[in-house]
From Swiss-Prot:
Its biological purpose: Associates with the EF-Tu.GDP complex and induces the exchange of GDP to GTP. It remains bound to the aminoacyl-tRNA.EF-Tu.GTP complex up to the GTP hydrolysis stage on the ribosome.
Classification of source organism: Bacteria, Pseudomonadati, Pseudomonadota, Alphaproteobacteria, Rickettsiales
Keywords, comma-separated and alphabetical: Cytoplasm, Elongation factor, Protein biosynthesis
MF terms in GO: translation elongation factor activity
UniProt-recorded name of the protein: Elongation factor Ts
Xref: HAMAP family: EF_Ts
Organism of origin: Anaplasma phagocytophilum (strain HZ)
KW Protein biosynthesis (keyword) present: yes
Keyword Cytoplasm: yes
Subcellular location: Cytoplasm
Annotated stretches, region: Involved in Mg(2+) ion dislocation from EF-Tu: 79-82
Length: 287
């Protein structure tokens, strides 16, 4: 059957597929738009799976926070060219809002969940077919206030609202929402993106990571031939510097270069007349 060119254009606009593929789909489905979309989806999936072995070195981080909930995810692509494609950006924003509604930090579960009449995983593979590159959802994060407080966010290298090359969410609890607290939360999110902490506190830093570092430092100090009492002080000093690099609460605030984050929380709490604490944070970045 002859397919009207405007119908072909409409299907192309909806799916992002090529003109020839859209024409073929409509002809195979007797002009039925919904069936043609499904036809393209199935055809696209087979193409995309062939790309799934390729490395993803680029992409975008998407973040969405509203009220007492925040969501963040990392969507990978092979090149920056595709990462800046409108379809890729739209997918990332749609997925992060879907994660916001899904309400659980579970990559596997979210990937299997419903999205736009399909599954998240299938939508990603279909997008890969249209974009011509491997597309991978490599990480999801979800945070929620458990009491009075605020969720702050920051996007670095922003290409559009809520999308960039790195982003962070931070949950501040202990005081009622205020402009001052919200501004402070954003500053902390900016610090997190810049300083890239591996853990919130020393207690939450992986014991394996700490043990490996302590063993390395001990070997280095042993080579100095110092008395045990002196060597132990050197080890503890170097471990403290290690924690100041790795642990958020021990880091020096990048905006003033002198105040530790844990001390900054005390200062802000005194200003707001409420004890303020960081309940959680999430950070994703494109390497």
């Amino acid at each position: 059957m002859k397919i009207d060119v405007e119908v072909i254009k409409e299907l192309r606009q909806i799916t992002g597929a090529g003109i020839g593929d859209c024409k073929e789909a409509l002809e195979s489905c007797s002009g039925d738009m919904d069936k043609a979309r499904e036809y393209l989806r199935e055809k696209g999936l087979s193409k995309a799976y062939k790309k799934s072995h390729r490395d993803v070195a680029d992409g975008l981080v998407a973040v969405f926070a509203e009220g007492d909930v925040g969501a963040i995810l990392k969507l990978g692509s092979e090149t920056d060219f595709v990462a800046r494609n409108e379809k890729f950006r739209s997918l990332a924003l749609g997925l992060v809002r879907g994660l916001y509604g899904y309400g659980v930090e579970d990559l596997e579960g979210f990937s299997a969940s419903s999205y736009d009449g399909s599954r998240v995983a299938d939508e990603i593979v279909a997008a890969a077919a249209v974009l011509g590159e491997n597309v991978v959802l490599s990480g999801v994060g979800f945070v929620k206030l458990s009491g009075p407080g605020v969720i702050g966010s920051y996007v670095h290298g922003m290409v559009s609202e809520g999308l960039g090359k790195a982003a962070a969410l931070v949950v501040l609890e202990g005081g009622p929402h205020s402009d001052e607290l919200a501004s402070f939360a954003k500053q902390l999110a900016m610090h997190i993106v810049a300083a890239k902490p591996e853990a919130l506190s020393i207690d939450t830093l992986s014991s394996d990571v700490v043990d490996r570092e302590r063993e390395l430092v001990a070997r280095q100090v042993e080579a100095l031939g110092k008395p045990d009492s002196v060597a132990q002080k050197i080890i503890e000093g170097r471990m403290q510097k290690f924690f100041e690099e790795m642990v958020l609460l021990e880091q020096v605030f990048v905006m003033d270069g002198q105040t530790k984050i844990r001390d900054l929380l005390v200062q802000k709490g005194q200003s707001l007349k409420h004890e303020i604490r960081i309940a959680a944070y999430r950070l994703f970045a494109i390497a």
